[in-house]
């Protein structure tokens, strides 16, 4: 990231332990280095064999696996499903440019080498209808295993934090994110209420009218001045702006 204003967002700060398996579509995306796999990003299971994550999480030179049904990373709980990713099954949005995170399109799809086994601890995320826009202050939750504070450790247990949505009208004001934020993004947080942000690539979970949860955002970036910077909410790729691309990519692969 060459931009002075942003960096990959990788923490839930001032969050809380999630209820185990409550965000049952949350995955850990891990890359291989020196014979071991390391957590790098979050993601959401949107089909039995497809995960959505952030474009900046993917490097085509790396080998990845996905862990589903995870809660406490330090314990083998028996619910985990570890699924390898084949090299040709990483689909980063064609307009993603790693030198311009503010340009948007920070989204990628990962095809699993086999289908997940769905159950109470591994479920599919619901996606919003195309074009759906959240109202200001919508009570969304971020989730992830990101760092607990800047430069700090990764937590063992999945964290969550309430991040109210900041609508485009507010988030694009000059003293907030200004022109950095685009209409294809969602802002949430930006004050001290909930602290910070979750793993890059992970979900912004928002309640739908029927009481279910929908993944409205893919965690993209935060302020370089730190996590819970006033008027610098966490910025997410707006999933409802990319429904067509998601559908087309899955259908053709």
UniProtKB/Swiss-Prot annotation:
GO terms for biological process: digestion; proteolysis. Monomer. The zymogen is secreted as a ternary complex composed of procarboxypeptidase A, chymotrypsinogen C and proproteinase E. It comes from Bos taurus (Bovine). Its main location: secreted. PROSITE patterns: TRYPSIN_DOM, TRYPSIN_HIS, TRYPSIN_SER. Disulfide bonds join 41-57, 100-103, 140-206, 171-187, 196-227. This is Proproteinase E. It holds the Pfam family Trypsin. The lineage of its organism: Eukaryota, Metazoa, Chordata, Craniata, Vertebrata.
